[in-house]
Curated annotation (Swiss-Prot):
Its main location: nucleus. GO terms for molecular function: identical protein binding; rRNA (pseudouridine) methyltransferase activity; rRNA binding. GO terms for cellular component: chromosome; nucleolus; nucleoplasm; small-subunit processome. The lineage of its organism: Eukaryota, Metazoa, Chordata, Craniata, Vertebrata. This is Ribosomal RNA small subunit methyltransferase NEP1. S-adenosyl-L-methionine binds at T176, G201, G206, I219, S220, N221, Y222, P223, L224. PANTHER family: NEP1/MRA1 (PTHR12636), RIBOSOMAL RNA SMALL SUBUNIT METHYLTRANSFERASE NEP1 (PTHR12636:SF5).
């Protein structure tokens, strides 16, 4: 669901598995805690099928990606085009920087191709650069959590599957797919006071295929990247809920 990224390739950089502290973005309003099952209006986004896995290179671990490890992937019979952690990075930047998240009305989960489920604390500030994001993901996948720099709060943590166990009871669960024939106006799907789940594919090709969604929708006449899908969804919710 994501177009190939252009521009300059990141400089070669290796990461050892060392625990680091990461910044938080303080909210303007009191927000629901990460993973809260209580009611109240809230958008829950699941980045499904994310390519996040580590590989040992020499004595260090790196986040596997198509640019840095192409020859290794080909040697093991894997399509480099399917190993795109940058899609998750771009999507997280869109989501966590959104006014909807700053207002305390967004919760994000990441479900990887390797069946690892990650909960993202709404106060997490995603690294701006891809290299730093890779280091963060290596730390998370090996330590199972990443804490805030100013306290014991966990900003990212690996949690127990399935993701549906972490949803508010009775909430609507919607998947996004370009293959759906009819186009939906996202604003018409926004509930006035209830939580709702949107599932966005965090991969380069294919479609979302999960058992827990109740309906699938297409939101554009054109195929969209995962990051743009996230931006359109959060913007629609901001418009309906009056988040400026």
């Amino acid at each position: 669901m994501s177009a190939a990224s252009g521009g300059f390739q990141p400089r070669e950089r290796r990461f050892s598995v060392q625990e680091q502290d990461w910044e938080t973005t303080p909210p303007k309003k009191l927000r629901l805690g990460a993973g809260s099952k209580c009611g109240g209006r809230r958008l829950i986004v699941v980045l499904e099928g994310a390519s996040l896995e580590t590989v040992k290179v020499g004595k260090t671990y790196e986040l596997l990606n198509c640019d840095r490890h192409k020859s290794m992937l080909l040697k093991n019979g894997r399509d480099p085009g399917e190993v795109r952690p940058d899609i998750t990075h771009q999507s997280l930047l869109m989501l966590m920087d959104s006014p909807l998240n700053r207002a305390g009305l967004l919760q994000v989960y990441i479900h990887t191709q390797k069946n690892v489920l990650i909960e993202v604390n709404p106060q997490t500030r995603i690294p701006r650069t891809f290299d730093r994001f890779c280091g963060l993901m290596v730390q998370l996948l090996h330590k199972l959590s990443v804490r805030a720099a100013d306290g014991p709060q966990k900003l990212l943590k690996v949690i127990k599957n399935p993701v549906s166990d972490h949803f508010p009871v009775g909430c609507m669960k919607i998947g996004t797919s370009f293959s759906v024939e009819d186009i939906s106006d996202i604003r018409e799907l926004v509930p006035s006071s209830d939580p709702v789940v949107f599932v966005v594919g965090a991969f380069a090709h294919g479609k979302v295929s999960v058992e827990y969604t109740e309906k699938m929708v297409s939101i554009s006449n054109y195929p969209l990247s995962a990051a743009l899908t996230c931006a359109k969804v959060t913007t629609a919710f901001e418009e309906v809920w009056g988040v400026i």
